[in-house]
Amino acid sequence: AGVAAALSLGMAFSASAQCVNKSGEGTNSTADGAKFQAWEAVLQATDWGSWASWMAGPQKIGTAPGYKVSKVRVTCKAGGLGQSCRAFATLCK
């Protein structure tokens, strides 16, 4: 099993009071694991309730229960525990 860690980054608000731009970083022994951790960090930085619902559901990267998600981007590179990924998205309530 891979070891994983996540870090949430930034807290910029967009022009609409109901939207936020978020980013998160994750590291894991695999790219898929690091992407998962990065998206978890985005959700945790946005809304712990949405994160909990996401964890109980299909756990699809780019989705957030209770939010419309757009501008999703994930970039990965070698680093950290094997792979390091950053996820970026705009989430609107």
Q: What is each residue range found by the language model?
A:
Residues 10-17:
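Sec/Tat signal peptide C-region and signal peptidase I cleavage site
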Residues 68-93:
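C-terminal edge-of-domain segments
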Residues 17-22, 77:
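C-terminal alpha-helical interaction appendages
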Residues 63-67:
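Acidic-leaning, charged glycine-interspersed low-complexity segments
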Residues 3, 20, 42, 69-74:
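Extended aliphatic helical segments
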Residues 21-61:
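Short, well-ordered alpha-helical segments
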Residues 2-10:
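Bacterial N-terminal signal peptides
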